[in-house]
Each structure stands twice: as C-alpha cells, then as structure tokens.
C-alpha cells in the first residue's frame, strides 16, 4: 500500500514537472516525464557513433530519468552495448 502511495506521488510530480523537462531539447533523446504517469517513461532513442539507434528502456522504472530527458542517454549506451562495445 505504501509502495502504491509513493508511485502515485511520483506520478503527480512527473505530471507537474514533465512539461518542463529537458527531453525535447536533449540531443540524445526525447524523454517525457508526463508519460511516466502510465507506468513507463518514453523510450530513449540514442544514436551511437556508428549511426545506429539504441533504445533505452530505463524510463520504465525511473520516471524521473525521462522527465529530465535522460532516456536518450541510456539509449545511446544501449546502442553501444548492442554492438558489443
């Protein structure tokens, strides 16, 4: 029950600040805090040096990551990981 309450509070915070997140301005990805309300953040899309997309899934667990537009950074890292780097 406590965990549910915390999730609700975090969701409200995500709604309050998601509109002002840096996702849209972040060249590494487009994380949207508002979408964290629905239990997952927007997938971060990063491009590694080889020009391939890496899709970050970290927003699923951490709404604040997407709120601040960090989803794409995780995606970039995943892109390297997917290539074996």
Curated annotation (Swiss-Prot):
Biased composition (Gly residues): 22-32
PTM annotation, UniProt: The N-terminus is blocked.
Tissues expressing the protein: Hemolymph.
Sequence repeat residues: 19-25, 67-73
TM segment ranges: none
Keywords associated with the record: Antimicrobial, Fungicide, Repeat, Signal
Coiled coil: none
Positions with biased composition (Basic and acidic residues): 63-85
Region listing for 2 X 7 AA repeats of Q-H-G-H-G-G-Q, in residue ranges: 19-73
One Gene Ontology biological process: defense response to fungus
Signal peptide feature range: 1-18
Disordered as annotated region, ranges: 22-85
Main function: This protein inhibits the growth of a variety of fungal species. The antifungal activity of this protein is enhanced by the presence of sarcotoxin IA.
Subunit structure as annotated in this protein's UniProt entry: Homodimer.
Name used for this protein in its record: Antifungal protein
Protein's organism: Sarcophaga peregrina (Flesh fly)
């Amino acid at each position: 029950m406590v965990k549910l309450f915390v999730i609700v509070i975090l969701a409200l915070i995500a709604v309050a600040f998601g509109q002002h997140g840096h996702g849209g301005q972040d060249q590494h990805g487009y994380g949207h805090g508002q979408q964290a309300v629905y239990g997952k953040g927007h997938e971060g899309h990063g491009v590694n040096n080889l020009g391939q997309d890496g899709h970050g899934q970290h927003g699923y667990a951490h709404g604040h990551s997407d709120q601040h537009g960090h989803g794409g950074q995780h995606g970039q890292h995943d892109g390297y990981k997917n290539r074996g780097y």
